[in-house]
Amino acid sequence: MDVVVFGAGSLGSLIGGLLAREHVVTLVGREDHVHAVQEDGLRITGEIQAVVRPRASKTVSGAADLAIVTVKAHDTPAAVEALSACDCDAVLSLQNGMGNEERLAALDTEILAGTGTYGAIQDEPGSVRCTGLGEVVLGPPDGGRSALADRVGDAFKAAGIETTVASDMPKRRWEKLAINAGINATTALSRVPNGALSDGPLSDVARRAARETARVARDHGVDLPDEAAIAALESVVDATADNESSMYRDVQSGRRTEVEAINGYVADSDVETPVNETLAALLRGWERESKLGE
């Protein structure tokens, strides 16, 4: 399979690198990373050890069987513009937050939704560290089965990536949103690793945010019980106790966060969500004062 990874940062480089063991992969990313991969290949360290030689470029062109989008949610419009120059048979979103698949639909090709739980950190150009093994779950964003999803799933499995092709992606997307709503903003604002949410006052904040997200999911017609959302949250907190969330790292580095696609998405619903409203307001205020807006 000919694959383009748009947004070759941490997760994009890891997934793209793993796929490159079996497929023709082009990583599209920043100049320093692209140059390093072109010169010396991509080095994968940590839980997975490998050196692979995918193609690397700063721009998108030509054709591909699949484009994988791994950019931040607020960069999805830029991804749509860039990928319009590529004749892609399908696009898979492996992004945080909601609304990405709807924006990518402007490309007028088949869209798949996905989640990735592999831990990844890009320490330096040309290298990515796998900090935790996980899986990729993918399927049609509105649920059901599709031959495309099965084909992409088989391609991922052939490259040694733990993969599930799911028919219940709406529920899985909302469950992931509940996890992110509980973990990301709470850890970013309190400057703590994920494990700090296992008990105490921060645990209560995270659980309430996840519970509110489940309530909004049900308002959208998705059967996500409060208990399921909280159980998923607790499972991720336990499994990633030593990790810093992506939003925490964004705040540490003075970068714009994905709050609009996570807590902001929940808070902007017609359901009362006081915890998510507060978390979103705090992060929006920080971004505004830091001049990190649109």
Label for each model-derived stretch:
Residues 31, 45-129:
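Rossmann-like NAD(P)(H) cofactor-binding subdomain of soluble oxidoreductases
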Residues 1-53:
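NAD(P)+-binding Rossmann beta1-loop-alpha1 motif at the extreme N-terminus of oxidoreductases
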Residues 86, 103-107, 126-176, 185-227:
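Internal alpha-helical scaffold of NAD(P)-dependent oxidoreductase catalytic cores
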Residues 3, 24-25, 91, 111, ...:
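Hydrophobic anchor at the start of a short beta-strand
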Residues 207-294:
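NAD(P)-dependent Rossmann-like dehydrogenase/reductase catalytic/cofactor-binding core
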Residues 111-114, 163-167, 275:
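General beta-strand structural signal in soluble alpha/beta enzymes
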Residues 33-38, 100-102, 146-147:
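Short, charged/polar "capping" segments at the starts of alpha-helices
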